[in-house]
Amino acid sequence: MGMVPDREPYAVGMVLDTPPGPGPAEVEVRRVASREDFLRSIRIAMESFGMSGRDLEEAMARADEEWETLRSNDAVVQFLALIDGEPVAQARATFTPIGVLLNGGSTLEPARGRGAYRALVRARWDEAERRGARCLVTQAGAMSRPILARLGFREVCDIRILLDRGAAGARGPADG
């Protein structure tokens, strides 16, 4: 079948069904509304997770197509968090008729611990509330699980992540 464990093969499903606290006053959050902000969000994500070189090139090569998809799909919303006017964190959410799925978020290392991610969770909660959704749901790995727990998310299930080595673009643990 070709299925192999992902680099981080275990995660938990988490849900937030009560309003999170606000982000700090020093953090401004805005919806990504321009191609430039979208490119900034890609760079933040890549740098935050230690990706560069080929990974960054591939992400930037897909950027225009992804930007057009984001612009034309109101169900997916991207946010940037700024401190002192500088983008330091990014996060995405997908809105469905029954809830909101948080799709990743990342904060540049120098800004960690300053509330940017907390502010992004609150922004996505506020958007969910505006749309009539009652909860936020996410898949959390080892890095994000304790952060999300501090923000009020609770664990609801265990997830084992497998990749199909035969699928285009699939990268397993041996791919580094």
Tell me the role of every PLM-derived stretch.
Residues G152-G172:
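Short, basic/aromatic-enriched C-terminal tail that caps enzymatic domains
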Residues G104-E109, G113-D126, R130, R145-P146, ...:
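Conserved acetyl-CoA-binding loop-helix of GNAT-fold acetyltransferases
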Residues V4, R134, R154:
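Short acidic/polar active-site loop segments enriched in Thr and Asp
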Residues R54-P110:
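A conserved beta-strand-loop-helix scaffold within acyl/acetyltransferase catalytic domains
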Residues I44-L56:
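Helix-loop element at the rim of GNAT/NAT acetyltransferase active sites that forms part
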Residues M1-F38, G50, T138-A140, S144, ...:
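Acyl-donor-binding surface of acyltransferase catalytic domains
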Residues A128-A140:
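Conserved GNAT acetyl-CoA-binding A-motif
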